[in-house]
């Protein structure tokens, strides 16, 4: 049988390869299947026979595949702090930024992890992936495989997305299943993903890049060059397994960057630096999460809050009031009204006092509290316009006081009068230093517009992330309760409870704040279990 000459067709040869490489059969077992000698199979597999087939096969495999998802076989990263970034083929690194990252990793005991992507291979006459060149300075940091960073967080090092992709996170919403994911890409983006109500929201993050701009000078390349970020994502894992992610965004010329109160350079670092501003997640005082309040701004709680650690020059407050006592959404709901009655939470004045107390907790000599006009705050004036004090005895006196103040203001021609600000000052005259922004009043922190809540878009339409993107400037906003970053627009989350009663079903809400540094770069921090960092 072994001396018999066999002539296989192409389909047979492909099947032999499948049996060998996918099924893992021995040459002897394959020979039995084809009723031929073992040497016949061996000669074919070593390329001694069927040279025409091998010429074609080596140019492009005729068939391949895998039953199992190899991406589920994730490497488990060792350590408690990681810095993720990306690098492009045939492109020099930003030397100063890389050195600043290396400084960071040395000081903070962190691991630098770089995932590679390729672009414009034809421009370098690169025919095969193995011909790609990467700057030797980062080769020791390259990880191009999926990694488990912590419970609930995966690094997608295997993902290769063109740097010209407008929405690099598109299509990845369930790629990491029930976990959050870090995706290597030159942009800095973040998206909140919904989870069942009793679970934390998931996130998708991109990393920014450590390599220089290197684009084809056409439409897609020009746009990508504009949005190219010298950046990285820091991930810390504490002893309880909770992980905390935040963005690093380097200065273009110097390669230096802030991370919380530290400033890193190619030569070293400084600490104890103050930040420029913090945009708290929407406050909703009547539904405030007390743990978030203690962690974020309260005094004398046994540890330094975010406010007293980072000492921002400005605190931006959105939806300071919730207006739960008399909200237009449930003012005609008898069951809700009875619940408010039994809970003794019907008094609008009491809710205003509670809101004023929250603002008072935020006051510091080093920081100005700025209240951004928001839809829940302006609901108070809507209440004055639409409701009848005669049918609301518990609020009648306060209603009439506020209504009279409003009419006096209109009589004087004071178009800047705000009912919410007036109500706060009525119950807490000591808060006169708090600044209340008016409708469409601009408030710039560095070059970032912070005077918009997020409920209004353009031309009177509803607010959306795309509406702010199109305006051509950077924004820090709130309103959605779902933290996000997209092309210069940053969304804060919520400081109130994650379940406010009306947000039924799955939720993408998170208790997240925006930090703006002295150089105008930003990061988002998300609180978990009363913690905001490792």
Q: Regions from the language model: what does each represent?
A:
Residues 7-25:
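Short, amphipathic alpha-helical "recognition" segments used to contact nucleic acids or chromatin
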Residues 85-90, 116-119, 157-160, 184-187, ...:
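Active-site metal-binding loops of divalent metal-dependent hydrolases
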Residues 58-149, 168, 290-418:
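Core catalytic region of metal-dependent phosphoesterases/phosphodiesterases
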Residues 29-32:
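Short alpha-helical "recognition helix" segments of helix-turn-helix
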Residues 152-154, 158-241, 448-530:
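Conserved beta-sheet core of the metallophosphoesterase superfamily
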Residues 45:
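DNA major-groove recognition helix of helix-turn-helix
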């Amino acid at each position: 049988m072994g001396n018999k000459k066999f002539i296989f067709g192409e389909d047979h040869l492909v099947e032999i390869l499948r049996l060998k490489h996918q099924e893992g059969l021995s040459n002897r077992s394959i020979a039995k299947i084809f009723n031929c000698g073992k040497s016949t199979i061996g000669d074919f597999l070593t390329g001694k026979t069927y040279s025409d087939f091998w010429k074609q096969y080596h140019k492009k495999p005729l068939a391949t595949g895998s039953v199992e998802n190899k991406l589920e076989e994730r490497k488990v990263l060792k350590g408690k702090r990681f810095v993720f970034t990306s690098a492009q083929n045939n492109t020099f690194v930003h030397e100063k930024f890389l050195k600043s990252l290396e400084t960071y990793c040395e000081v903070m005991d962190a691991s630098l992890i770089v995932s590679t992507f390729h672009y414009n291979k034809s421009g370098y006459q690169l025919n095969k992936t193995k011909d790609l060149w990467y700057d030797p300075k980062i080769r020791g940091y390259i990880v191009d495989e999926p990694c488990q960073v912590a419970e609930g967080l995966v690094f997608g090092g295997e993902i290769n997305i063109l740097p010209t992709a407008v929405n690099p996170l598109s299509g990845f919403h369930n790629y990491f299943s029930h976990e959050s994911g870090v995706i290597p890409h030159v942009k800095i983006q973040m998206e909140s993903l919904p989870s069942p109500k009793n679970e934390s929201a998931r996130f998708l993050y991109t990393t920014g890049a450590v390599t220089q701009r290197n684009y084809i000078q056409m439409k897609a390349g020009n746009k990508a060059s504009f949005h190219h970020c010298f950046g990285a994502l820091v991930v810390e894992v504490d002893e309880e397994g909770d992980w905390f992610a935040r963005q690093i965004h380097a200065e273009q010329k110097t390669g230096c960057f802030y991370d919380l109160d530290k400033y890193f350079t190619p030569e070293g670092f400084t600490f104890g630096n103050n930040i420029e501003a913090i945009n708290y997640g929407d406050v909703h005082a009547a539904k405030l999460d007390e743990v978030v309040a203690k962690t974020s701004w309260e005094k004398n709680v046994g540890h330094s809050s975010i406010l007293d650690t980072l000492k921002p020059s400005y605190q931006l407050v959105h939806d300071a009031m919730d207006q739960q006592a008399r909200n237009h959404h449930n003012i005609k709901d008898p069951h809700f009204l009875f619940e408010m009655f039994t809970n003794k939470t019907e008094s609008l004045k009491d809710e205003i006092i509670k809101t004023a107390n929250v603002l008072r907790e935020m006051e510091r000599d080093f920081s100005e509290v700025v209240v951004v006009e928001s839809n829940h705050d302006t609901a108070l004036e809507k209440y004055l316009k639409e409701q009848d004090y005669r049918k609301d005895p518990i609020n009648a006196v306060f209603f009439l006081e506020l209504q009279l103040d409003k009419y006096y203001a209109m009589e004087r021609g004071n178009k800047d009068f705000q009912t919410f600000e007036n109500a706060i000052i009525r119950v807490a005259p000591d808060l006169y230093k708090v600044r209340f922004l008016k409708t469409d009043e601009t408030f710039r922190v560095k070059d970032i517009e912070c005077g918009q809540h997020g409920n209004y878009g353009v031309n009177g339409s509803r607010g959306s992330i795309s509406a702010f993107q199109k305006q051509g400037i950077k924004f820090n906003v709130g309103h959605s309760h779902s933290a996000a970053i997209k092309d210069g627009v940053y969304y804060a989350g919520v400081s109130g409870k994650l379940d406010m009663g009306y947000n039924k079903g799955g939720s993408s809400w998170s208790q997240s704040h925006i930090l703006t540094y002295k150089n105008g770069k930003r990061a988002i921090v998300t609180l978990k279990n009363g913690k905001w960092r490792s």
